[in-house]
Amino acid sequence: MGVAGALVAAVIVVVGVLASSKSTSAPTTRSTGVGALAPNETFTTTAGRQATIGSLRGRPTLVWLVTTWCSSCHAGTEALAGEIGHLASSGVHVVELELAGDLGQSGPSITAFARQYAGAASANPDWTWGVASSRLTTTYDPAGELEIYYLLDSSGHISYVNSPLVSTMSGLLGAVARLTANGHA
């Protein structure tokens, strides 16, 4: 076997070793892209109830992850308070969650945040408030953005992702209209 043959054999051995060394216990990346089934992570509502993203199936849901200290989250919540009636009449439930640990910054509790920025609309039964688990936070916000939202169809598939809500509201409302028109509401 010449040098070329030995080199080819060495490459084959290295590729084989690398392929066989992949751990089957390594965490898998869970897709949060459009079309994917939303990963089933947990959160705690302000009423103290543990819930999962999977438990939201059955109707379209806007899952919005926020930090309670960011100004665009404040403005987005105020804007969403003006649209909650429209979203509810379209069959969309809103779940607004504080990112775990408020991404390491100090901000008001999600309950105080809701009252301050959503006002009376914070008590709307079509708007659930809570705190994301650490795993939900890292799964849905791996880049550590101050806010990000996901529109889920009634079967729990992600149909739209964007941020920040205050400046992308028209896109969100358009996505809701398309979801409703397509019979996924």
Where are these regions (language model features)?
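Short pre-active-site segment immediately N-terminal to redox-active cysteine/selenocysteine motifs
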Residues: R59-T61, V66-W69, G101
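Loop/turn elements at helix/coil->beta-strand transitions in domains of secreted/extracellular proteins
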Residues: G58-T61, S89-V95, N124-W127, E147, ...
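A short beta-strand-turn-helix
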Residues: N40-T61, I84-G85
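Thiol-/selenol-based redox modules, centered on thioredoxin-like
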Residues: E145-A185
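Thiol-based oxidoreductase modules, predominantly thioredoxin-like and allied folds used
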Residues: G91-G107, S122-S134
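N-terminal targeting signals for export/organelle localization
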Residues: M1-A38, H184-A185
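Short, internal strand/loop/helix patches
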Residues: T111-S154
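Conserved redox-active cysteine motifs that mediate thiol-disulfide chemistry
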Residues: L65-G82
